[in-house]
Structures are given as C-alpha cells and as structure tokens.
UniProtKB/Swiss-Prot annotation:
Role: Catalyzes the folate-dependent formation of 5-methyl-uridine at position 54 (M-5-U54) in all tRNAs.
Keywords: Cytoplasm, FAD, Flavoprotein, Methyltransferase, NAD, NADP, Transferase, tRNA processing
Amino-acid positions noted as binding FAD in the UniProt annotation, renumbered to this chain: G8, A9, G10, L11, A12, G13
Entry GO CC: cytosol
Organism: Exiguobacterium sibiricum (strain DSM 17290 / CCUG 55495 / CIP 109462 / JCM 13490 / 255-15)
EC annotation from Swiss-Prot or TrEMBL: 2.1.1.74
InterPro entries cross-referenced by the UniProt entry: FAD/NAD-bd_sf, MnmG-rel, MnmG_N, TrmFO
The reaction(s) this protein catalyses: uridine(54) in tRNA + (6R)-5,10-methylene-5,6,7,8-tetrahydrofolate + NADH + H(+) = 5-methyluridine(54) in tRNA + (6S)-5,6,7,8-tetrahydrofolate + NAD(+); uridine(54) in tRNA + (6R)-5,10-methylene-5,6,7,8-tetrahydrofolate + NADPH + H(+) = 5-methyluridine(54) in tRNA + (6S)-5,6,7,8-tetrahydrofolate + NADP(+)
Protein name (record): Methylenetetrahydrofolate--tRNA-(uracil-5-)-methyltransferase TrmFO
Length: 434
C-alpha cells in the first residue's frame, strides 16, 4: 500500500495531505497539538491562522492573487476553505478563522485515506515523508532536522495583531470604507488629527515591549514588522505605512484625516475586528493603553493580545530542489514557511507542490517542477537557487517571474501584470490533470 507521512497539519501540511489523499495515497498526518502546544497557536484545529485573518489581495493584477488562482486550478483545499469562509475585506480575501480551520480539519479527518495522529514526532521517519512543521517546530524534531541538514536554522521574528470585541468600538467615531472605495466598504476606519497622531506616536515609542532572550537577535521579516519597531523609525514611517490616510476620506467631513487606523472584520458574524498592520510585541497592559488612545477605541476590549514568536527556516538553496525534495534524500520533502516562502498562501502553495510530487514519487512517476512563468514555480525556483548566504524569506511577487518578451517598457503596471497573470494561468493548465 502506498503511504506518505506528513508531519504538521498547518496550511502546508494540510494542503499536502489533501493532494496526496485525493490521488489515492494513504496519508499518516501527524499533528502534535493539542498534546503539545506552540507559543503562537490557540486551538487544536488544522490550518490555524496564527497572525492576520487576511490572505491578502484577490485580484489577478497582484502576484498573490495569481498564486491563489493557480491553486484553485489545482483543486487546493486551502483555497476552497478560504473562499467558503470569506468575510468582507474590500479587494482582499479575508476569512473567518474558525470556519476556515474547521472546514480544513473536518475535510481531512473525514477523508478515508487520511489517518490523523495527535502526537509529536521527535525524529524524521524513514519512508516517503513531507516535513511541514512550520516555523515553530518542536525542539526534539528541530534537533533531528539539524542533524540531517548539518547546519543551524536561520530565523526571524514574526508578530500578530490584537483582536478587538466589535461591541466595544464607538461607532459614532469611526466610519466604514475601503481604500479608494475599492470593492465593498469593508474596513472600520478610526481617523486621527495631527495632534492626536503626535500624542499617539509619542506614547507608542515609550511603551514597554516584552524583552527577547539574551541569545536572540532582533531579526524581523519586513512584511510583518512589529508596529512599535516601525514607529521607532519616525512618525512618517507610520503615516506612509499602516496609518496612511490616502483614499480614506471621512464621509462626515469629506476631508482626508491626518492619519487612519483601519480595523478588519475577523469573523463572519462581524463581532471581532483586528487592527490592520498592528502586529506587536508590546506588553499586554501597554497594548491596552496604546490602543485606547485611538479615536473610537477608548473603551475597546482586547479578546486576543498581539504576540511575537521566533520563526525558523532552513537554508533551502543548499537543501532543496524546486520539487521541494531534499537533494540528498529523494523521498524526503519540506514544505511551508520553514522552506523560506513567506505568507499563508505561499506556505499552502508549497504544500500543494510537495503533495503532488510525493504522490508522483510513490506512484513511480517523475516529480515535477512548475514552470518559472507560474507563481508557484517562480517561488520554488527562488528559494532553491538564491545565493545561500543571502537567503531570506520571500512573498509572492511579480519580480520572481521572467519578464515578458517584447516591448513592455512603456506598459503600465496593471496591463503588464494582467499579461503576466494570463501567461501564468495558461502555463498551469498543463498540470491540472496530474
């Protein structure tokens, strides 16, 4: 009987297990939660979203939007769950995190080809295996992986934003609007005057953070930089970043505020909201104090505080092939954020590729590397060919794919991106029947 072990039921591991199971392969899916928890998880559900509830842009003029559509073409479980659990978010795809994880969990637990083991694996097993344990891999398995790779992990710090009780937001002081009125009005906006912003910034840069351990250097991924670190770079960093007011005119005044804090719906009932871009490592008391300086949030109750955790990843250029197989053991695959792809969708996409290729391997077919013209292929190529000493995690972006042939120099970005998207989706068609 053809069997594959998948370690970790996060986004990547869940997607890999689904791709294997739907191809008739028996899957042993190991997830140590709830027997052993991580510093960032709160539930025992598969594919739990530990940071934002947003899977980012949904349009084909955005690289991650193209990646999502490629995955839909390949019957992605994660994308199906996201589409079913979506909540209003303008031009983005955001989800009710409970419904999303619940759908993934039930689908896999009820699949006849999936056997779930709630236990910790402390060493890499023999036989076809996909390691998708994520950036918070347990200490014992980390040691086993270090022995296999022969080198220490690389790492950076990741942070999550607080989530608020929607009933404690003063609706008289906030307004519903998406930036530039793109899509449906999906964000609650808290406008600030210059005086309010200056006071807020001054208090934020004085706020106490949770100290790192002595041996940990502060290395952050720019896409998930703690809010207080951004603030320390100067007030304009916030005004041109998460608090930029452009395209968010206040309907009461018809004018653009000096600064805006956006709140994104976090569940389908619309009772919870997260603060967009407010991932933080402030002490909990400080989080409450700082958030209550924001107009409309003076009495806001925090239902989940922001946290920061250390994310580890392997040196994929030295370790992996574009098929996500290891270079030295062809029946061992890695997938997810630990490979250096950064983001929910990117992690799931790597699991999709690893799952397809592990299924092909046990069925004695040659594993495939997706074309570099596709976003899935471009990411796999990037993480496996970048100069090892300069390797850092990467989001999906159009800079990873080959340029268009011909005269594109004067082409506007939306037009160029539309052509790149069309090319990618045409290229992925050859792989939809695998």
């Amino acid at each position: 009987m053809k069997r594959v072990t998948v370690i970790g039921a996060g986004l990547a591991g869940s997607e890999a297990a689904w791709q294997l199971a739907k191809r008739g392969v028996q899957v042993d899916l190991y997830e140590m939660r709830p027997v052993k928890q991580t510093p960032a998880h709160h539930t025992d559900q598969f594919a739990e979203l530990v940071c934002s509830n947003s899977l980012r842009a949904n349009q084909l003029t955005n690289a991650v939007g193209v990646l999502k559509e490629e995955m839909r073409q390949l019957d992605s479980l994660i994308m199906k769950a996201a589409d079913l659990a979506s909540v209003p978010a303008g031009g983005a795809l955001a989800v009710d995190r409970h419904d999303f994880a619940g759908y993934v969990t039930e689908t896999l637990k009820n699949h006849p080809n999936v056997t779930v083991h709630h236990e910790e694996l402390e060493a890499i097993p023999e036989g076809p295996t996909i390691v998708a344990t994520g950036p918070l891999t347990s200490a014992a398995l980390s040691e086993s992986l270090k022995q296999f790779t022969g080198e220490d992990y690389l790492y950076f710090f990741d942070a999550a934003a607080p989530i608020l009780d929607g009933d404690t937001i003063d609706r008289d002081k906030v307004y519903l609007k998406s930036r530039y009125d793109k899509g449906e009005a999906a964000y609650l906006n808290c406008p600030m005057t210059e005086e309010e912003f200056t006071h807020f910034h001054n208090e934020l840069i004085k706020a106490e953070v949770v100290p790192l351990k002595e041996f940990e250097k502060e290395i952050y991924f720019e896409g998930c930089m703690p809010f207080e670190v951004l603030a320390s770079r100067g007030p304009k960093t916030l005004l041109f970043g998460p608090m930029k007011p452009v395209g968010l005119e206040d309907p009461k005044t018809g004018k653009r505020p000096y600064a805006v804090v956006q709140l994104r719906q976090d569940n389908s009932a619309g009772t919870l909201f997260n603060l967009v871009g407010f991932q933080t490592h402030l002490k909990w008391g400080e989080q409450k104090r700082i958030i209550r300086l924001i107009p409309g949030l003076e009495n806001a109750e925090i239902v989940r505080y922001g946290v920061m955790h250390r994310n580890t990843f392997v040196n994929s250029p030295n370790l992996l092939q574009p098929t996500y197989q290891t270079r030295t053991r062809h029946d061992l695959f890695f997938a997810g954020q630990m490979t250096g792809v950064e983001g929910y969708v990117e992690s799931a996409a790597s699991g999709l590729t690893a799952g397809i290729n592990a299924a092909r391997l046990v069925n004695e077919a040659e594993p495939v590397a997706f074309p570099k013209e596709t976003m899935m292929g471009a990411m796999a190529h990037y993480i496996t060919t970048t100069e090892g000493k300069n390797f850092q995690p990467m989001n999906a972006n159009f800079g990873l794919v080959p340029g268009l042939v011909g005269q594109t120099g004067r082409m506007k970005k939306p037009e160029k991106y539309a052509l790149l998207a069309e090319r990618a989706l045409e290229a992925i068609k050859d792989f939809t029947d695998m």
